[in-house]
Amino acid sequence: MAAPTPTRTTDWWREAVIYQVYPRSFADGDGDGTGDLAGVRARLPHLASLGVDAVWFTPWYASPMVDGGYDVADYRAIDPAFGTLDEAEKVITEAAELGLRVIVDIVPNHVSDQHAWFREALAAGPGSPARARFHFRPGRGEDGELPPNDWPSQFSGSTWTRVPDGEWYLHLFTPEQPDLNWSHPDVRREHEEVLRFWFERGVAGVRIDSAALLTKDPELRDFTEGSDPHPYIDLDEIHDVYRSWRAIADEYGAVFVGEVWLPDAERFARYLRPDELHTAFNFNFLACPWEPDRLRRTIDDTLAEHAPVHAPATWVLCNHDVTRTATRYGRTDTAFDFAAKRFGTPADLELGTRRARAAALLTLALPGSVYLYQGEELGLPEADIPLDRIQDPMHFRSGGTDPGRDGCRVPIPWEAGAPAYGFGGDAGAEPWLPQPADWARYAVDRQSADSDSMLALYRTALGLRRSEPGFGDGTLTWLPAPDGVLAFTRDDGLTCVVNLSDGPVQLPAHHTLLLASGPLDPAGTLPTDTAAWLRA
């Protein structure tokens, strides 16, 4: 297979399409039911033929897997379930041979409770240098029986766990993920060495998990709703960390993308200053409902908040933490909110898929970079996981009220007629999460043979985006359009029209149709919930 044409600019990341791989669910090379690096290596040609520019891997490091690998025990070792460090290096090399860059995940807010540092801290006792790398504190109350403060966990419950000697340690997520103390020089030094470790092995970039949570109020004061500053979100000191990281990345020509959930546009933009992160995820677009006015406002706001720091926007519809797009868009309320996930809400998958196809063309036409989550190119819906098969700690921490995120993490279907749809080969074990019985229709081989499939749409759209200089980084100009319709031009006369109205609309005159997300009406009009790319 010929290597894809490289992206057009030196700053490739400004307009790249980056594919997210959740290794545990991507492809199983040894047939044990869990995805691994052998499976990734075998399926890299799929990503090259899809037309993406880079591949982001969620954590593949040694981990007890309490939180899907986001509880890292050793950044310099690959978890045995996935393979070896040698295999990871081969993934990086073989991806490069196919024209694909590799981005790895770093989780700097916390480590696993099985990390050598935390085990040392538990053994060392109160007041020890080993405990200073974390947030150990005596409790409140007459006998220290109460947590040191009232901070709520990201996964429900308290952020504090007591150890046998009476002290408590902080964990914004699960008790198995103790938070690091970023005012400690060992913590900063270790992460800088980890960055160099992976940059030396050829990775092109790093995605930073929970990027706004690292630094904490040194006095660990109680949380008050609306307090400014927040005691552990977006403290000013965090920017010193990212300035030091940027200097390291610049030595290698590598890039950063931050997971930054912030409602304040000005505070968000600070992370994207020229000496900090290159890009950050745009979650407002992901959470936006399928409504024309809301989408246009979100697009405008996103471009405006990036403009002062000259950073490219990123566009994402789905990831390993949120309800899949085809399901969300098939509901009456099409927005996404972690506090209101609408579990069990019926979804019209035919409608949701039609909208997801249109959303794909909208997203790929916007200026900046795009992230695709594995299975988006197949139109996978959210899966219902039986209660006895749920593995996400979010479910257990919520007392069972939150089904968790497993429904968007179900293993990929590759071959319609194979056991487990080819996830683990012909003799593979049962996958770690159950696949729905009707997923043969979503399999890669079946969609590859169908010119009208979601996969065919993505391959065509990505090929056009790569070949057309007007797409990617650049400008966007809105066009006059009927109510319920989004229409804008990019450079070189490229036009995108998305019909979110209740009826068909006329396409602009004197334009050539390049691609549509669905068939046009017999009269040549654009149906509802359909998008088109045209050239003047």
Task: Describe these PLM feature segments.
Residues 512-516:
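Local beta-strand/beta-hairpin segments that build beta-sheet-rich folds
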